[in-house]
Amino acid sequence: MKKLEDLILTYKDFPKKGIEFKDVLEILQYPDIFQDIILKMSSNQFLKKAEAIISIDARGFIFGSAVALESSKPMIVARKPGKLPGQLLTREYDLEYGKNSLSIQVNALKKFNSFVIVDDLLATGGTVKSVSRLIRDQKKKILGLITVVELKSLKGKSKLDFPVHSIVTL
């Protein structure tokens, strides 16, 4: 049986020179491993206390949807520019390789007060921090982050002021 760490592929110089991109999509080709990851993510203690999940564009949707289904929690999406209709909350953030922004629909947040963020990977923490600020600006709570992979060398966890649970740390 394959090990999870073996399914996280590295692409050098992607999306630009000097970046080592960690790709989790290989996991989806192994349903038994994917299911095990989802069960582990769904059994997290701070998820049990959350009213809803927020997943981050785009690979976060894969894991967030499955965790939402397994845990019977509603899911809200944080999307990149130009992808959501309606009234939006938007925040810019820094990446290892540039800047971007994320938006969440205002109406989606009105229904809930406490959230867990689900994403595929924690690197520098910029994306997750951006989402957490969007939520907190609305006087809502972030109970934690659940992610498949944490890249320890990039120290993203140290930039967050809420619990982080990663299935694997590289």
From Swiss-Prot:
The Gene Ontology CC terms held by the record are: cytoplasm
Gene3D superfamilies per UniProt? 3.40.50.2020
Read off the Pfam families from this record. Pribosyltran
Q: So what EC number does this one have?
A: 2.4.2.7
Keyword annotations of the record: Cytoplasm, Glycosyltransferase, Purine salvage, Transferase
Q: What class of enzyme is it?
A: transferase
Q: Output the GO biological process annotations, alphabetical, semicolon-separated.
A: adenine salvage; AMP salvage; purine ribonucleoside salvage
Which pathway does it serve?
Purine metabolism; AMP biosynthesis via salvage pathway; AMP from adenine: step 1/1
Quote the subcellular location field of this record: Cytoplasm
The source's domain of life comes to Bacteria
Q: Which molecular function term from Gene Ontology is one that the record holds?
A: AMP binding
Main subcellular location: cytoplasm
SUPFAM superfamilies per record: PRTase-like
Task: Describe the protein's quaternary organization and the partners it interacts with.
Answer: Homodimer.
Q: What does this protein do?
A: Catalyzes a salvage reaction resulting in the formation of AMP, that is energically less costly than de novo synthesis.
NCBIfam families per the UniProt record, alphabetical: PRK02304.1-5 (NF002636)
Which named protein is this?
A: Adenine phosphoribosyltransferase
